[in-house]
Amino acid sequence: MRLVQHISELPPECRGAVVAIGNFDGVHLGHRAVLNEAAGIARAKGCPLGALVFEPHPREFFQPQAPRFRLTPLPEKARLLGELGIDLLYVERFDAELAARPAQDFVTRILVKGLGVTHIVVGYDFRFGQNREGDVSFLVREGEKAGFGVSVTSAVNTSSSGEPYSSSLIREHLREGRPRRAAELLGHWWRIEGPVLSGDQRGRTIGFPTANIRMDECLEPKHGVYAVRAELVEGPGAGIYDGIANIGLRPTFDKQDVMLEVNLF
């Protein structure tokens, strides 16, 4: 997968894709319906498969002081999208200029002149442009004028509750301490990724060596103790381990930072 961050300067091989558009926070099963639709169209047309995301997340831009809510920071999102077969991941910076851009301008500058899209796929509730003025009906009309196709996927409901798959519902499950319910909606276990911090090493003295990760970018789930599987991706101890994790204030030594502290078996 190729990561593309300068949409206004695309080489020819990065244009003309079938592009799924969204924030895709969590890359959950509802998102996968959009991505699978795009993949099928890309195969039929013989075009590259792309995804267009926005960084920072628009909510982070408009509410910078709000509690952290991200299910998947960009590196994790890119990993998941790559596993789903995305060829081109377009990352458009969300800033004051983009927030103030009319929907018509978004279509002209980004979709047509920037990406040169062949076809786009969005969810039924997709909104864009200044004050969220653009909706899927507007997008379909503009696509007809500009010569690109538009597909709109309907809501995908969960089998258990009948509710639509949504990042908001997954966040609620995690904040209420229901990781298994969250995993059912994600289609995979929720994952926290980050560098292991150098601690005070006192865990070794009581027989429980730990790996500590600061939770700076992602949602803070309900504090408590969880059974986990941990992967160390580099170093002499690289591998996959079972473990027990505490999420919250470091209870052993009365630290005040919110941490993910994993005891590895």
Where would I find each of the regions flagged by the language model?
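Phosphate/ribose-recognition catalytic cores of enzymes acting on nucleotide-derived substrates
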Residues: G199-F265
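Glycine-rich, highly charged phosphate/nucleotide-binding loops
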Residues: F69-K77, R101-V107
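Short acidic-hydrophobic, aromatic-tinged amphipathic segments that line or gate anion-handling sites
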Residues: R2-E9, F69-T72, Y90
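Classical nucleotidyltransferase
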Residues: E97-P209
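A glycine-rich helix N-cap at a beta->alpha junction
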Residues: P73-Y90
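Residue-level signal for inorganic ion chemistry
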Residues: H28, L81, I120, A182, ...
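N-terminal catalytic cores of NTP/NDP-binding nucleotidyl/phosphoryl-transfer enzymes
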Residues: P11-P73
